[in-house]
């Protein structure tokens, strides 16, 4: 087993979710298809609720910002032609959601609606979040060693809490000290990691970021964050240069904390 020694100055471990703590297959084969298959029914059931209308307003604002993109799908204004017909408006929102998801967009508006849909599904017991078997034991060990553990994902903070609160391992939210999403910045921008360090109240070199995405790893590294790239089944392959440049682990159990001995 490869062992990666965690630098002594590290006091915070920052975790990505998809492809790092959780199989990509769970996200791609269960979470995302659930949204596509149920978004119209969800909107019809919750259309009159303020939370749903807030989601729609955010999606409409995003659609306006996207109007210059090829193939962009508009969401009409709340007043005007067809606005009095909820089904017509719902279809416009559904079409926009499908379009964004087909491009694997990570917009805050899309993530917020997805998070609300997943909340309903998790609370109804329709699904449980999957974690790799090495994750929970390792995180418990890190916390016992005095480490802080945070999560940074493109999924909304609410969606993150749903995953950790409704997992196949039970409710493991207590293992996480805090959550960050794209509201603090995108994961491929180095400034986001500086903001996270400021929010936590530490230096960037006190953080070890675990992710499966090399572009995120590069951005974090540029900010002065320590990085390890997690190689899991189903993850995108790495180039030879990336394999040489980054520290690689295939399991959280491969991290060695000098402070835990």
From Swiss-Prot:
Keywords in alphabetical order: Amino-acid biosynthesis, Cytoplasm, Hydrolase, Magnesium, Metal-binding, Methionine biosynthesis, Nucleus
InterPro entries reported in the protein's UniProt record: Enolase-ppase_E1, ENOPH1_eukaryotes, HAD-like_sf, HAD-SF_hydro_IA, HAD_sf
Presence of the UniProt keyword Zinc in the record: no
Molecular function terms, GO-annotated: acireductone synthase activity; magnesium ion binding
Cofactor names: Mg(2+)
Binding residue positions for substrate: 153-154, 187
UniProt-listed Enzyme Commission number(s): 3.1.3.77
Superkingdom, taxonomy of origin: Eukaryota
GO CC annotation: cytoplasm; nucleus
Binding sites annotated in the UniProt record for Mg(2+): 16, 18, 212
PANTHER family tied to this protein: ENOLASE-PHOSPHATASE E1
Chain's role: Bifunctional enzyme that catalyzes the enolization of 2,3-diketo-5-methylthiopentyl-1-phosphate (DK-MTP-1-P) into the intermediate 2-hydroxy-3-keto-5-methylthiopentenyl-1-phosphate (HK-MTPenyl-1-P), which is then dephosphorylated to form the acireductone 1,2-dihydroxy-3-keto-5-methylthiopentene (DHK-MTPene).
Family: Belongs to the HAD-like hydrolase superfamily. MasA/MtnC family.
Subunit structure and binding partners: Monomer.
NCBIfam families to which the protein is assigned, alphabetical: enolase-ppase, HAD-SF-IA-v1
Protein's UniProt name: Enolase-phosphatase E1
Organism: Bos taurus (Bovine)
Lineage, opening ranks: Eukaryota, Metazoa, Chordata, Craniata, Vertebrata
């Amino acid at each position: 087993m490869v062992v990666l020694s965690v630098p002594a100055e590290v006091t915070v471990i920052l975790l990505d979710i998809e492809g790092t703590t959780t199989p990509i297959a769970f996200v791609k084969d269960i979470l995302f298809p659930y949204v596509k298959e149920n978004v119209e029914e969800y909107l019809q059931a919750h259309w009159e609720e303020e939370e749903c209308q807030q989601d729609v307003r955010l999606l409409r604002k995003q659609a306006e910002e996207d109007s210059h993109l090829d193939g962009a799908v508009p969401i009409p204004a709340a007043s005007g032609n067809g606005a009095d017909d909820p089904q017509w408006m719902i279809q416009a929102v559904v079409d926009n959601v499908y379009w964004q998801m087909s491009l694997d967009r990570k917009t805050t508006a899309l993530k917020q609606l997805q998070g609300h849909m997943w909340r309903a599904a998790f609370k109804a017991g329709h699904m449980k979040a999957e974690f790799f078997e090495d994750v929970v034991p390792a995180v418990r060990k890190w916390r016992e060693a005095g480490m802080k553990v945070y999560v940074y994902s493109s999924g909304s903070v609410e969606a993150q809490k749903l995953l950790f609160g409704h997992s196949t391992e039970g409710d493991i939210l207590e293992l996480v000290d805090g959550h960050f999403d794209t509201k603090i910045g995108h994961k491929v921008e180095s400034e986001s990691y500086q903001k996270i360090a400021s929010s936590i109240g530490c230096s960037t070199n006190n953080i070890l970021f675990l992710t499966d995405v090399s572009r995120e790893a590069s951005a974090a590294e540029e900010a002065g964050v320590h990085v390890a790239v997690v190689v899991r089944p189903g993850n995108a392959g790495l180039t030879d240069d990336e394999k040489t440049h980054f520290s690689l682990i295939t399991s959280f159990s491969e991290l060695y904390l000098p402070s835990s001995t």
